[in-house]
Amino acid sequence: MPRTVKLKIYRFDPDKDQKPYMQDVTVELEDTDKMLLDALQRIKSDVDDTLSLRRSCREGVCGSDAMNINGKNGLACTTNLNELTQPITLRPLPGLPVIRDLIVDMTQFFKQYHSITPYLVNDSIRPEKERLQTPTEREELDGLYECILCACCSTSCPSFWWNPDKFVGPAGLLQAYRFIADSRDEATATRLDNLEDPYRLFRCHSIMNCVDVCPKGLNPNKAIGKIKELMVRRAV
């Protein structure tokens, strides 16, 4: 049966607005079992086509529609409207510059991601086929490779808010450990050297916001803890 959805949406167009404001929007949906992105798509198509947001896969895979939903970061496409208290308050991801409405500038986030060398480094002779792993070695990557780089975790972290140019952030550090833990990679020492800094790694204080908001159920804090353990072991 049809349902009415009430939302309060952060709006800001730098070309015409002096400051941000919250817009009250009401939209009708034909079905009660819908995702938040369905409501936003309906608003953009039928109510206000100036609303700006990122979205793509609608399946929780691309991570592009990450936003702050009722005070908690998440993906609009995997957040069921039935789980949300109305009016639903939507804001852009915190800690990053707002480009327009719910769209943020991800430049700093991806700069930190690229700083950890997010690819295999292996200078040994290339095998005729793939580089093999045992099942146990492969299992070490579970809970790491599934990250979709939506930035929900990093933008929920106070340390990233305060030091986005120095602290790699939960997402970047999770990816750093993903390659450190990979038996095919030969750059562990270099990767640890890259993180040997008062800010890049050790600014994590295990607040656990990153774990709470990850839409894929990953645990960046656990990965960060393992990197810290490796740092301590090589120092003694």
Predicted region positions:
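Short strand-turn-strand beta-turns centered on an Asx-Gly dipeptide
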Residues: 28, 68-71
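Short structural boundary motif marking the start of a folded domain
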Residues: 2-7
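Short, structured protein-protein interaction patches enriched in aromatics and acidic/basic residues
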Residues: 57-66
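Ferredoxin-type iron-sulfur electron-transfer modules in oxidoreductases and energy-metabolism complexes
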Residues: 33-46, 91-236
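Short, contiguous acidic and Ser/Thr-rich linear segments
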Residues: 23-34
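Active-site phosphate-binding and catalytic loops of NTP-dependent enzymes
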Residues: 48-54
